A protein has these predicted regions:
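Mid-to-C-terminal Rossmann-like scaffold of FAD/NAD(P)H-dependent oxidoreductases
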Residues: 1, 283-399
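Rossmann-like dinucleotide-binding cores of NAD(P)H-dependent redox enzymes
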Residues: 59, 151-152, 159-217, 297-303, ...
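Glycine-rich dinucleotide-binding loop and its adjacent helix/turn
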Residues: 109-171, 206, 260, 266-268
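Residue-level detector of conserved catalytic or cofactor/ligand-binding positions
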Residues: 399-407
Length: 408
């Protein structure tokens, strides 16, 4: 048996390791168009900010160590540019432009997602970055050092955007955050995001909500960011953290079915519409366990779980069904901890689902004990059955209840 895996970060690397554990004899080939595999995406902002001092700590495995440990043929800087399902072959392009073909018995797609980069005037100017991989991290780190950056604009206030805002701030950079929506951190409700807004402002971050960027202009003095309101923000660098989209180009080329939400369609066994081709990670869509509606979930833990399940299905046949994930996440925003799981009230309202919510304002521990910190928890649930739909928590550094919410 010959297995080919396309994409070597979260789901792909996990699947390769699991394949070797359950199948000691077959050939496993792992293709990655970048230079690195199996790295810690969530740690990238903290390396840029100097919290993580050693770059090597981001790399869970190198291509060489992974290949030797699991007896996997790891081919970095080898981009799969075409899949031919009828012939069970792929076309690969190397870094020097050479093309070749490989056959497979079963294939796994784990291409991840690509950053949203709208076609705005000036967006390709020097000093405007996205952050998605180790190469992006190196470019940003070098630019910060070589250009003595003093002012930065972060466009987008999701997890990566706010983590970058914090780390740039800690590095002595004056930070402005521009967000098109009326709040930061879209998975949580506005009422839970409001204290985060106050905290960011207290820390010295300039926050522009319900603002969109119209264009950028590069001058000798730096970059000017033009907003829809007519305001301008001067900057030495810009980080685009607008969001990501499933990387589906290869799947579309192969004629695989794309779902309603824009991700690669898979069945309960994570097999695509083509026999013997499976898919995992940020590129797939899957029914939400609470609603049955197709959705996209850009988180590492579900991708890793999918990787383990799909490896078993590729070896033993489609026997293990993936139960789905509800989008559990946790993030640090300066001194605050923000956690959420399941469906927020605004999402339930959007999907016209009957619900009630409960908000509790408490403390991280008993008030009579020193250093108690404010803690807010919000639950969403069905008003009749009491079925829990979701939970959100905001607290302060050192508060473990938000962490426990995340693990629940």
């Amino acid at each position: 048996m010959k297995y080919i895996i396309i994409g070597g970060v979260a789901g792909g690397a996990t699947a390769a390791a699991r394949l070797r554990r359950v199948d000691e004899k077959s050939d496993i080939l792992l293709f990655e168009k970048g230079k690195y595999i199996s790295y810690a995406n969530c740690g990238l902002p903290y390396y840029i900010g100097g919290v993580i001092a050693e770059r090597e700590k981001l790399l869970v495995q190198t291509p060489t160590s992974f290949g030797q440990r699991f007896r996997v043929d790891v081919r970095v800087e080898n981009e799969v540019i075409a899949i031919h399902p009828k012939d069970k072959t792929i076309t690969v392009r190397t870094a020097d432009g050479r093309e070749y073909e490989e056959t497979y018995d079963k294939l796994l797609l784990s291409p991840g997602a690509t950053p949203v980069r709208p076609p705005l005037e000036g967006i390709d100017s020097e000093g405007i970055f996205t952050l998605r991989n180790v190469e992006d991290t190196d470019h940003i780190k070098s630019y910060l050092t070589e250009n003595s950056v003093k002012r930065a604009v972060v466009v987008g206030a999701g997890f990566i955007g706010l983590e970058m805002a914090e780390n740039l701030h800690h590095a002595g950079v004056a930070v402005s955050v521009v967000e098109m929506g009326n709040q930061v951190m879209a998975p949580i409700d506005f009422s839970m995001a409001a204290p985060v807004h106050q905290h960011l402002i207290q820390k010295g971050v300039s926050l522009y909500l319900e603002e969109g960027v119209t264009h950028f202009q590069r001058t000798e003095q730096g970059i000017t960011v033009f907003l829809k309101s007519g305001k301008t923000i001067p900057a030495d660098m810009v980080l685009l953290s607008i969001g990501v989209r499933p990387a589906t180009a290869l799947a579309k080329q192969a004629g695989l079915k794309i779902g309603e939400a824009g991700g690669i369609w898979v069945n309960e066994y994570l097999e695509t519409s083509a026999k013997d081709i499976y898919a995992v990670g940020d590129a797939i869509e899957y029914p939400h366990p609470l609603t049955g509606k197709p959705w996209l979930n850009y988180l590492a833990n579900p991708a890793n779980r999918q990787g383990r399940i799909v490896a078993d299905n590729m070896v033993f046949g489609n026997k293990v069904a993936y139960e789905g994930a509800i989008g559990t996440s946790i993030a640090k925003v300066f001194d605050m901890t923000v956690a959420s799981t399941g469906l927020a009230a605004k999402r339930l309202k959007q999907w016209e689902m009957e619900y009630q919510s409960s908000v509790t304002h408490s403390s991280s521990h008993a008030g009579y004990y020193p250093d108690a910190l404010p803690l807010t928890l919000k639950l969403t649930f069905h008003p009749v059955t009491g079925k829990l739909y979701g939970a959100q928590g905001i607290g302060y550094e050192g508060d473990r209840k938000s962490t426990r919410l995340n693990s629940s």
